Amino acid sequence: MLVAVVKELKQGEGRVACTPENVRKLTAAGHKVIVEKNAGIGSGFSNDMYEKEGAKIVTHEQAWEADLVIKVKEPHESEYQYFKKNQIIWGFLHLASSKEIVEKMQGVGVIAISGETIIKNGKAELLAPMSAIAGQRSAIMGAYYSEAQHGGQGTLVTGVHENVDIPGSTYVIFGGGVAATNAANVALGLNAKVIIIELNDDRIKYLEDMYAEKDVTVVKSTPENLAEQIKKADVFISTILIPGAKPPKLVTREMVKSMKKGSVLIDIAIDQGGTIETIRPTTISDPVYEEEGVIHYGVPNQPGAVPRTSTMALAQGNIDYILEICDKGLEQAIKDNEALSAGVNIYQGQETNQGLATSHDLDYKEILNVIE
């Protein structure tokens, strides 16, 4: 199987899906690897580093000739022309956010594996480290855009407690998963007050125990509680994600209108469509806009802004699955690995992820029934 590591085209995306160490593991197992020129530069990996581990450096077009194309994010529109039947495309594809790319993949017969839907022991194994990074960075961005020079309220999130008592900011975090707790931990480190809105009762108890000694309030998620708590936010971070599916717009325009003027609103799951009615995707170089008097931050690839850290985490999670596909062939790997099978979103024209199929009103079939 010919494996290609391609350079990301998404604006501001510095990550690469495979490190030189991963290439060494693949070539040592007898697999041929090609790497697009400068694919790893943003993460600190030179072309020479890949070549030393057995990869061949190729052009963008040549990379897309591979049987297995390893990416970080979804293909750019300019790359749709390279799709071919039975080609495996691997990455955080977030296909629920775009019916166009789904139709392109379906029409050609591409096999799409989305890392965010690989679920092992009930957890999104590959997505978790990226969620942690996005959560931490969101808390930092909330502090940054609270400054007056960026259109914020002009507040210092830490407050001031030297001979005076000026309170810090209030972070309201929607959702209680990995991204949420990482955002909360950074906010607490900045001396902010944190309110977490969570639906699951067991998770609420877990969060209450985790933060028993901290300035954290955990609130049951209901539309009424969300509407009440969002008014308190200096920084509001939505972390709600339904793996493979497009989430509902739970934060309405009316709720956004009720927020403090100059407060900051961040949607970590904007790459899947987001849960905020007024949010739209932005870029790392142009990350914010103002609507209803609130600063909106909608960057869909936040880990791409810290590629040296996030690439190492991403590649460490990827490699065992990629090796299994290459060693066994995709169909056998799917049969042997339940977590991997959950990652297959499209197989030779058929939607095999129920959340994706529901999001675009398409026919769904279970992957094991398709490959039999």
Curated annotation (Swiss-Prot):
PROSITE patterns: ALADH_PNT_2. The keyword Metal-binding does not apply. It comes from the Bacteria. NAD(+) binds at residues 170-200. The keyword tRNA processing does not apply. This is Alanine dehydrogenase 1. Pathway: Amino-acid degradation; L-alanine degradation via dehydrogenase pathway; NH(3) and pyruvate from L-alanine: step 1/1. InterPro entries: Ala_DH, Ala_DH/PNT_CS2, AlaDH/PNT_N, AlaDH/PNT_NAD(H)-bd, NAD(P)-bd_dom_sf. It catalyses: L-alanine + NAD(+) + H2O = pyruvate + NH4(+) + NADH + H(+). Disulfide bonds: none annotated. The active site is at H94. Pfam families: AlaDh_PNT_C, AlaDh_PNT_N. GO terms for molecular function: alanine dehydrogenase activity. One of its GO terms (cellular component) is plasma membrane. One of its GO terms (biological process) is L-alanine catabolic process. It is an enzyme of class 1 (oxidoreductase). SUPFAM superfamilies: Formate/glycerate dehydrogenase catalytic domain-like (SSF52283), NAD(P)-binding Rossmann-fold domains (SSF51735). Keywords: NAD, Oxidoreductase. Belongs to the AlaDH/PNT family. The lineage of its organism: Bacteria, Bacillati, Bacillota, Bacilli, Bacillales. PANTHER family: ALANINE DEHYDROGENASE. May play a role in cell wall synthesis as L-alanine is an important constituent of the peptidoglycan layer. Its EC number is 1.4.1.1.
